[in-house]
Design a protein with these regions (language model features):
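ATP-binding N-lobe of GHMP and related small-molecule kinases
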Residues: 1-86, 90-107, 112-122, 126-129, ...
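Acidic/histidine-rich catalytic neighborhood
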Residues: 148
Length: 149
């Protein structure tokens, strides 16, 4: 499980701290919605913050995402192939969604937004399974994902 807790910032910059990673993330302005041309959007280190910044930017289409102060905590092992990046993206999406008072996106659209954040900001051309499972899973149930279309 990955969780993000925080509040709207009193400043114009986002401040982000991870309980699990010692590499600090310097304060940063709310990222703008990305340009339409394909390719990886340049993003300042640390690497783990690129996933967060990507989700924020893609949710900032209307320019209404506020700056925030937040803490991230996770029990998902990093770099072990168990979807830690998807967990971080989805936690970010739900955190920003709460800051905005609820965004009208379907669960499928939310998963695709998180996947695009990973493609465009982290430069990782991942599939969609991890994001879909992170958003749509129900305890005690299997989930069929048909990507044949």
């Amino acid at each position: 499980m990955t969780v993000i807790v925080g509040r709207r910032a009193k400043s114009s910059e986002c401040r982000l701290v991870s309980c699990n990673i010692s590499e600090a993330c310097p304060p940063f302005p709310v990222p703008p919605y990305p340009p339409s041309e394909p390719g990886v959007v340049p993003c300042e280190p640390p690497t783990w913050a690129k996933y967060v910044k990507g989700v924020i930017a893609l949710m900032n289409k209307n320019g209404d995402v506020p700056a925030f102060d937040a803490v991230i905590a996770s029990c998902v092992p990093l770099g072990g192939g168990v979807s830690s990046s998807a967990a971080l993206e989805v936690a970010t999406l739900f955190f920003v969604d709460q800051l905005l008072g609820g965004v009208s996106l379907s669960r499928q659209e939310k998963a695709l937004l998180c996947q695009q954040a990973e493609h465009r900001y982290a430069g990782n051309k991942c599939g969609i399974m991890d994001q879909f499972i992170s958003i749509m899973a129900k305890e005690g149930h299997a989930l069929l994902i048909d990507c044949s279309q």
